[in-house]
Amino acid sequence: MKAWLRRPTDTGARLPSLAFLSRCALAGLGLLTGCSADFTAADVAYFQPAITASSAPARPLRESWSLHNNTRRVGLAEMRPIIPAFNGQGALLASWNPHPAGVFGRPSFIVIHGGHGLNPTNFATALWLRDEFQANVLVLDSYWSRGREENWATGTRYGVNMRVLDVIAAGRWLRDSAGADPRHSFLIGDSQGGWTVLRSFTTEAFFQRELPGLLRAGIALYPNCKADGTAQYPRLGPYAGPVLIFTGGRDSATPIAQCAPATLNAASEWLHFPGATHGWDVANRGAHTPAVDGECGRAMNVYNQFPVCRSDATTAAMRTRIKSFVQGLSNP
């Protein structure tokens, strides 16, 4: 399948705060060795692009898969605009799947997507979490709600700072409207979603005013971890709560070489699979059908059509560690 060739653009966007821009300009002139600034309230408008959609596409990402077959067909709720945005302007799409015996007193998971947007792998992960932990599961969208399908360019206003604000919005809703216990609420994401996990738990004062009261821990699968201190690639770590990271040695989408050692070593635990590509847990037949082990495909990303090879063994090892991580925090 040929990749969708639309180049992402940012129109009508307010710039990040001067605190970001001035330090980054000096760094570019060689007057500073790094470029960093704290996220502030002045940055919220830039990282809250308008919500423009109230329904999800039936066949997302250039009609490459069926949303119905990966939600309703497998017993997951349809995507609905139920999460009030961080800035209070509109609602994010999400699939909310409370446990039939009640929400409180059991684990809850927020599942967040990568740069291709929600895909069958995210819904397969949601099913596994629901069944393995008898959990409540919220599958959160950040792109469809804003009239787009992907963020392949990565370092844009649709990147990690926007995503963290969406996580805060989802955590608020989960606690205040759904009745979940934040002491047992977990964030899990892959690729750019994994990046979002790392950024969410980074000791950034603006975010940490809220997140400790919303989430217990985070799980990052093959995360993007480029960090140069700019608004688009802000710092990652140290972390304000428990974080579990998984990486792959054959990952050419989010290669481990881009990760500062401190980003990985600051985690509660970091597991590396030397033979794994990006997306080793890919649901290559959809969430409704068992995956084909060993099959390799290519990403639709126009900037990097990296290989994605399913590995049942790596997926099983990862899930075993996730299970012990969650249980260890749920039953101290």
What residue ranges belong to the model's regions?
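N-terminal cap/lid segment of alpha/beta-hydrolase-fold proteins
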Residues: 47-102
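C-terminal catalytic histidine-bearing segment of alpha/beta-hydrolase fold enzymes
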Residues: 268-332
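Short beta-strand/loop motif that positions the catalytic acidic residue
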Residues: 239, 245-247
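Serine-hydrolase catalytic machinery in alpha/beta-hydrolase-like enzymes
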Residues: 83-100, 105-179, 284-307
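Bacterial signal peptide processing site
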Residues: 36-38
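Conserved alpha/beta-hydrolase "acid-adjacent" motif
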Residues: 252-258
